[in-house]
Every structure is written in C-alpha cells, then in structure tokens.
C-alpha cells in the first residue's frame, strides 16, 4: 500500500509541475494557434536561472519569479521574430530554442549540470517548515499543487479580461482584432510571453524538486506539453463546466 501511495504521489507531483507548462503551451498552441518550439529552450532556462540564483544564496521564491520573467522575455523574442521580422512561426521558435543553449551555458558558466544540494528551496523553507510532521513528507505535492493552482487561477482570471478576450480573438480571427483598433501582432507577442513564462516557471520548480539544473532537460518538452493539452482537451471536450486550463493540467497528470 505504501508503495502504491508513493507512486501516486510522484505522479501528481510531476503532473502538477508539468501542468504549469501545459497551461502555457495551451495559450500558444490552442489560443494563439502558434506552434512554439522555443519551449524546449525556455524550460531549461528556468532551471538554469534558478540553480544559479539559489547557489548564489538568493531566495528560492524570487528565483521562480525571475525565471518566469526571463521565460517571458524569450517568448517576446519569438513573437518579435515572427511579427516584426516576418519569420515563420516554426523557424522563430527554432531560432530562440537554439539561442537558449548558449544563454543557458552562459548562466551555468559552461556547466551542463549545475547541482545545488542542501540549499534552500520552495520545498524546505518558509511556511513549509511549519507543516505537521504527519504531512511533511507530502510537502512537494502540496507546494507544487499550490503553485499550479495559483497559475491556473491567475490565467483563468486573465482570459476573462479585455486583454484576454483579445488574445483569444487574435488566434481565431485576427481581422476582428484589427477592426477593434488593436494590433493582433502585439497580442501574439503577449500570448507567447505568457506561455514561455509558465514554461520557465515549471522548469524552475522542477529544478528545485531535483536540486539541480540540466541544460538538456528541455529536449522533448514541447511534445510532452502538446500531448498533455491534446489529451486533456480531447477527453473532456464535452464537459462544459470544465475550463481548458483544468483539461491541460489533467492531461499532464
């Protein structure tokens, strides 16, 4: 029984973390209809930034925020290459993904793996320390679930705003956005920034769970996240009360 519970716990821990990435890819793939391959580069970007900051003694929660911002900037670059320089969506993602290899190596000072064992992380500092001993062993599950829930709530709230509705429209009907005196290209850049920010945040959380960063960890992440979105939306497409972000998270689990 203990083995089964342990396996189930690990499934949900990984599922919650990758669910954050899946929600980000949902924005770019489903909402924006943009096949964003830069995800394979921004995921390890979040890991490398987090490992570098925690090794230097920075607050682990601050490392998560910085990772999100860095991922968003990478997403902006992908959008600018596509919107302003008229480079195709696939090639824009490939260029940024390739560039991230050099950026990540620069952050880790040339090391492919950057461990930070026995350092402070979001899983062993702050409010986690006051958890009762009986549930302390589930701290990773609890923290990862809370982080996922926060991202999901914020994303759901954003998609209900005027900017969020324009973001949806920019993917489905760019001409409508133009008729509203808005720039669909700018909305595309915003969408890619949000998507890659979530991806880098997921990388940041996973690196703190593993207490190390690996620049090769991004390989296949775009396939995994797309599979999560497709599986979730396909299985629960007829469930009207379920939000798309929830479907993406369930698909990741």
Predicted ranges, named:
Residues 199, 203-253:
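Transmembrane alpha-helical segments in multi-pass inner-membrane proteins
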Residues 1-21, 49, 56-62, 133-141, ...:
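Membrane-interfacial amphipathic/re-entrant helices at transmembrane-helix boundaries
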Residues 58-98, 148-152, 251-253:
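Alpha-helical transmembrane segments within multi-pass membrane transporters and channels
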Residues 89, 93-95, 100-160, 189-190, ...:
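Transmembrane helix-bundle core of multi-pass membrane transporters
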Residues 41, 61-69, 91, 141-146, ...:
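Hydrophobic alpha-helical transmembrane segments
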Residues 31-34, 56-58, 84, 242:
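Helix-loop interface residues and adjacent transmembrane-helix termini in multi-pass membrane transporters
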Residues 27, 52, 76, 80-85, ...:
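Membrane-interface helix caps of multi-pass small-molecule transporters
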Residues 153-193:
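Membrane-helix/interface signature in polytopic inner-membrane proteins
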């Amino acid at each position: 029984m203990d083995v089964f519970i342990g396996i189930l716990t690990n499934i949900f821990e990984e599922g919650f973390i990758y669910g954050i990435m899946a929600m980000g890819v949902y924005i770019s793939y489903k909402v924006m209809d943009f096949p964003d391959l830069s995800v394979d580069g921004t995921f390890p970007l979040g890991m490398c930034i987090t490992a570098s900051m925690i090794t230097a003694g920075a607050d682990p929660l601050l490392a998560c925020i910085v990772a999100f911002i860095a991922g968003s900037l990478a997403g902006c670059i992908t959008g600018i290459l596509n919107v302003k320089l008229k480079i195709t969506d696939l090639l824009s993602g490939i260029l940024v993904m390739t560039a991230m290899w050099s950026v990540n190596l620069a952050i880790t000072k040339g090391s492919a793996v950057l461990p930070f064992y026995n350092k402070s992380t979001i899983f062993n500092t702050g409010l986690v320390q006051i958890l009762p001993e009986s549930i302390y062993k589930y701290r990773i599950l609890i923290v990862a679930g809370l982080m996922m829930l926060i991202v999901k709530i914020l994303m759901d709230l954003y998609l209900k705003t005027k900017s969020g509705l324009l973001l949806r429209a920019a993917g489905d009907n760019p001409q409508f956005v133009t008729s509203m005196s808005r720039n669909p290209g700018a909305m595309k850049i915003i969408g890619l920034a949000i998507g890659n920010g979530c991806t880098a945040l997921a990388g940041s959380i996973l690196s703190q769970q593993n207490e190390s960063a690996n620049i090769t960890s991004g390989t296949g992440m775009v396939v995994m996240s797309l599979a999560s979105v497709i599986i979730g939306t396909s299985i629960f497409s007829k469930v009207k009360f379920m939000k798309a972000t929830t479907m993406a998270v369930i698909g990741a689990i």
